[in-house]
Amino acid sequence: MTQAKAIVAVVLLALLPQLLHSDFILTMFVFAFILGMLAISFNLIFGFTGQLSMFHAAAFGLSAYITHIAMTSLAVSFWVGLLIAAGAMFVLSAVIGTICFRYKLKEFYFAVVTLAFAEMARLVVLNWNSMTNGSIGIAVTEKPMLWWPGRGLLAVAGTPMWYYLSLVALVIVIAVCSRIVKSWMGRCFEAIRLNDELAGTLGINVFRYKLLSFTIGNVIAAVAGAFYAFYIGYIEPDYLSIAQSLAIVSMVLLGGRESIIGPVIGAFILTALPHAIRLNAELRLLVYGLILILTILLMPRGIFGTFMRRRQPNVAATPVTPAANALKAKP
């Protein structure tokens, strides 16, 4: 997507609340924006670096709990609580990543170990009743405070305000991740995804860049988790569940993991679909599983990747180059 098209898309989305007076549709967009951030952050680890992390849902859910606990226990604002949660995820991700990457875990083994850490986090949340309220969850009544042009400092309450806040956050995440992917760091990610052993022989510090990808992705997931919980006003252990991890993987594979925009498309579809056909929680898992199977079999590049491939039949959506070519032209 060119810069001009991106600007037009953002302007149209900014005008949408003025054109549509449906709170239901705006609510779907808010969820899609927040889950779009989550999908992009996962794709940074999975799509661009080739690491199938099953800890992502845990980072998403833990951040919601930490933000709320910081606000209530330390009497700080939402934004300070979010910084504390992001910092906690940075440290926790660095520890988990160091353990995994020092032992050179990858593919199936990396997925299993990160899943084990995620399940440990879920069990802590589920059983630490004094802090998390266990399986009952926490009702969130606090609101983020934000300065609005012409209106001063206001609590972010109501769907229209959350719409603009989540849209701005999504645009920032897209811009930051696009910059990362196009940078020298992004080329190192690509080289590691293609062949991490060859990347190491070319002088890339594989441990360092895998750890960077894992940590950055989880910190962005932490932001998405806090936004999600404070928008719906409730936090529960299911945020850290395997079902949530499956949903994240489905978003990325459906939209396409070879781009930044692809996961956002997947998030929009999987946000709207369950509400459009009135699916309950159990049927959603079945749908996510079917989507994973059909996408892998019929559209391995995802919706966005398949569209770009058909639009430019002689050029892949993201050129698949040897690891050595991925490192040309160091800035």
Predicted segment positions?
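Helix-loop-helix "hairpin" substructures at the membrane interface of multi-pass membrane proteins
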Residues: 157-236, 330-331
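Extracellular/periplasmic helix-loop junction at the C-terminal end of a transmembrane helix
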Residues: 117-155, 304-306
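Transmembrane alpha-helical segments in multi-pass inner-membrane proteins
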Residues: 57, 210-298
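Alpha-helical transmembrane segments within multi-pass membrane transporters and channels
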Residues: 74-117, 265-267
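Hydrophobic alpha-helical transmembrane segments
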Residues: 3-8, 28-29, 33, 58, ...
